[in-house]
Amino acid sequence: MLKAHKYKDFDWVLVGTAAAIFIVGLLFLFSAMYSKNIDFIIRQIAWFLIGALFFIAIININYRKIISLGYVFYFLSLILLLIVFFFGSKRLGAQRWLELGYFNLQPSEFAKLFITLSLIQYLTEHKTEKVVKNIVTAFFIMLVPFVLILAQPDLGTALMLVPVFFVLLYIWGVRLKRLFFIIGGCLAASPLGWFLLKDYQKERLMVFMNPDIDPLGAGYTVIQSRIAIGSGGVFGKGWLSGTQNQLNFLTERHTDFIFSVAGEEWGFAGGAVLLALYYILVRRAFEIARKTDDPCGVLAACGMATIIGIQVIVNISMTMGFMPVVGLPLPLVSYGGSSLLVTMIALGILE
């Protein structure tokens, strides 16, 4: 638990909950893809095993040593983001991936973790006396990779950095009044961001307000997702029996919209169980922060908890039409090696 690890102190609640979420996720993934391509299951398990190796390695390293390399990770993330900008493969209008033979790597996924570590290192090394100077510096630490990620374009991952940034500032000691002032300034400037968005991102924001304006185009996935979740009722249609899923009405059902599969086949009850597991996981992470006396450890635990928790909130809200589609995976559930590996590393830091 945020220290040089001793197995008698192993947090079985944290690890057991994460394992349960992953197993449930495999069931959803199998249902989403078994009639299409079973390779997705094999790859997901392979990534999990790789992630398990990283997890085991990290729990045997004092978390302070990992945080002390935050700036190294930061520059590594910038290098990876620049490489993908020039040499990355393009899918669905976005250039986010590096092809590595059988696997693909998404640098922006690693960047959100590495940037968090660099912010933690900076805030740990600087006191709160020079608040304005340190906030501005921390902001620019976040801003450079934010722009590179947004240029891919990957709006979801870029926006993920914002709540992490504010949570870390609050834990570090910035008063709420000052935080609200900064957030207000960001919100006031946010309309300018419209001009930085790609056309398909603008379409997503428009269909968020009214998916029916383009029911066969930009609004199609959200409409089908809401139909799937709504038709699941209380207990669902049964595993492998979701009509929206099995008849291929749901697009991206193995990645960003896998919760739609859960809602249709396992219903409200199944979705509630999954949400309860996530609640236990994130709450446990914040409990670790509460029990830690070291300011660096508190920042680390809260940072990892925020990365996981915000993704869950945004992804599930997105599938139900409560938020615009921004392309964030559901941690430990959505198909994707980079996301899974980053989550396993975050859990290793927490453990």
Feature locations, PLM:
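Transmembrane helix boundary and interhelical junction motifs in multipass membrane proteins
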Residues: D154-L159, K237-G242, R253-T255, A272, ...
